[in-house]
């Protein structure tokens, strides 16, 4: 369940923008909300605005985040991360993406930034009983696991590259529930419809041919 998504410096989006599913103070239609702890969550939402106002690029940012989490484990040495930065942003300005979500009744917070086509930083926290616990923080290639995870990410750290997300590496080379839950949220729970795709048959065939994770299930 999505709670909040933020991004900046992505295509036409220069400054940070935020999309929240957390309800405001209006309790007119309280029966339509979903409760999670102290949060009152909208079950659906609509983004609307004028043509060219950035709606599609905001969805594009969420799609970019999903795809990078799911597939960056396959990035080869020397292969950069595509950074769709704002055309007026300086080359050294990072593109930032962050998200909060609930999976199996636990809240998670995850985010990363891309600078000059490389992963700059990354983090994952979760909130058992409402209290923040660090799973990992990462700056460049320096990964700092939380106290509960000392030593369990050694293999994942050994394969980390500056073009790979650590979440993607750890999901494939560790057996940590919090990592798996976060990874599966992106891999299965987020579904992005792309209106630019007209032929879904060709798109499906292309995915089956090029997406290694899908190949494993075929």
List each language-model region with its residue ranges:
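Pre-Walker A-like glycine/lysine-rich segment at the N-terminus of P-loop NTPase domains
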Residues: 1-64
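Structural beta-strand/beta-sheet cores of well-ordered domains, especially the beta-sheet scaffolds
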Residues: 3, 95-97, 163
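Short acidic, glycine-rich loop/turn motifs
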Residues: 7, 11, 101-103, 126
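Solvent-exposed, flexible loop/coil residues
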Residues: 17, 23-25, 90, 140, ...
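Conserved P-loop NTP-binding catalytic core
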Residues: 34-36, 40, 45-46, 50, ...
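Electropositive, glycine-dotted interaction segments
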Residues: 109-218
